[in-house]
Amino acid sequence: DFHSHILPGIDDGSRNLEQSIYMVNEAKNVGFTKIISTSHYMENYYEVSQADRKAWLNGLQYGLEEKKIGLSLYLGSEIYFTDKIISLIKEAKASTINGSRYVLFEFPMNAKPINIEDFVYSILSANYIPVLAHPERYTFTQEEPEIIYQLANQGVLMQSNYGSIIGQYGKKAQVIVEKMLENNLVHFL
């Protein structure tokens, strides 16, 4: 699982350790063997340091081992759109995916950000690989799906939600993710 919110009390995901263990066990029961914890990082809202998230991740991994739930956890962040994205990574506030060059980011859900191309260029020019979280769910990409293709042509990889495929996020998201799948534009689920 490339995108999850399993760390307790960090963002809008799990509320406590018991819920985190339950969520991970459910993922294991449907076949997952590895989960990347991608807690939100949003300036002035969700600002838990990489060191603190790593400590929570280690605590959760220990809890899983105690309960004999064999599944590997990795650290990452889902970084909210900001022109400071590179400095957040370099200052160890936000995390790349498991210390790699992959950077998971998200846009505002209901507004098209300005300077998208400059934002993507800043990630690429710092030698990172941008990965856009759930492109099928943004209002502006639902209105202008060609933006997804433009971003892909710029070098952005796409991470879609399984829930979009089954209609959990509405018909528009489902139609867009189906077209993305047809065009090999879903790189991670």
Residue ranges of model-derived segments:
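An N-terminally biased module of ancient metal coordination in phosphate/nucleic-acid-related enzymes
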Residues: 1-70
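Active-site metal-binding loops of divalent metal-dependent hydrolases
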Residues: 4, 40-41, 78-79, 135, ...
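Metallo-beta-lactamase
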Residues: 5-14, 145-152, 160-163
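Non-catalytic positions within long, well-ordered alpha-helices that form the structural scaffold/packing
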Residues: 28, 124, 181-182
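Histidine/acidic-residue-rich catalytic or RNA/ligand-binding cores of hydrolases
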Residues: 142-149, 169-178
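Short acidic/histidine-rich active-site segments
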Residues: 186-189
